[in-house]
Amino acid sequence: MRHLFFVLLFFASAVQAANKIYSPTVKTLTTIVNNDWQNRPVMELGSADILYIDFDELSHDARRYICHITRCEADWSESSDVFESDWLQGFNDYPIDDYQHSLNTTVNYTHYSFQIPNEQCRIRMSGNYRLTIYDEDMGHEKVIDAEFYVVEPLMTIGLSMTTNTDIDVNKSHQQLAMILEYKDLKVIHPDDEIYTVVMQNWNEQTARVNPPSNYRYQLGMKWDHQRDLIFDAGNEYHKFEVLDVSHPTMGIDRIMWDGSRYQAYPFTTTLRRNYLTDKSANGAFFIRNSNSTEIDYTCDYVWVNYQLDAPYLGEIFLLGQWTTNADPTAYQLQYDATNLCYRAQVMQKQGYYSYQYTTREGLSAPTEGNFFQTRNKYQALVYYKGLSDRTWRLVGYRGLEAL
């Protein structure tokens, strides 16, 4: 029972890692390492990796935004036992000076962008990092929190997946097995020195934190037939593209101008009773339009109208890497008892979007079904804190796509 409490305690902490937007006038936060838009941002320490951060503010009034970086522990609590000079080379709290006003769009916005490392700062220690953006014109108001990871691959992670699980065989679940090799790092008490996080499609709400290992030996640890590493298989993500406001594109039934804004209508979704074979980006999104030029400030904003035909099945939410509003009700579908359907309207920038319907806890909604064939992506993060160390370092990262 004590171990279960420990896992649940840190499960709640892991949820805090998600990107969040706090201002109603800030939209479309993206954090991309190099060109890997389908993954969360993971940088390798000492490499040439670049983290690109972009967002929009819904006006043509240039604002003074300040970026502050905070180093966090494995559970995303703020690091308190290391100095800023231990992990940051350069200066913190620097202004975001690179911005561009939108061009030929029906919604005015200003696009802001910057990157890490830059002339002001460079990260010099592995671990979890939270980037906070403040609006100086609004009295140092916090408008954005964004997460990123910096890994130094000092340990080796082996990760595999099977649909022949300890619950069922080729039905509704997927089970992971994991092997960790310490390599040159000295581990005496794994319970105190090793911290592991395993996620499905980067969903922090359903992360498995410190699942108990079955085997421990001098050179590593092994997780095999571990029920804590069994995940609901879910179904493929929904997807659509809004590339041109003059006509519908992939996944869009119709798009129209209502006199003041563009309204886009993805095809109505119904209960999924079978596996959907259409591959998607597992919650990722990518801003683009049919012109493919200067997309950062030429893509327009449209109001996307979601409809899910189903009997009432409790609260249902949209979930993707783009659902970053700090208020989760911004993505809650409202039930229409007259027409027996769920509906939501969300303001989104032109581009490709993938998403799923979930419960408030981040689990797949009853409308989606669970099918062993689903091509989920899994992520394993391993942190190390030696007995004399002051902080957790991220020493291993491994991704796996279930095919």
Model regions: which residues?
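Bacterial Sec-dependent N-terminal signal peptides
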Residues: 1-19
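Contiguous beta-strand segments within globular domains
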Residues: 25-71, 169-180, 291-306
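Extended low-complexity, serine/threonine- and proline-enriched intrinsically disordered segments
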Residues: 61-90, 188-211, 313-324
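Aromatic-rich carbohydrate-binding modules that target alpha-glucans
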Residues: 87-113, 204-213, 303-349, 362-388
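Ligand-binding face of N-terminal immunoglobulin V-set domains in extracellular IgSF glycoproteins
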Residues: 106-136
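Low-complexity, Pro/Ser/Thr- and charge-rich linker/hinge segments at domain boundaries
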Residues: 150-171, 373-396
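Long, internal scaffold/assembly segments composed of regular secondary structure
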Residues: 192-275
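Basic K/R-rich, polyanion-interacting modules in nucleoproteins and related proteins
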Residues: 265-312, 392-403
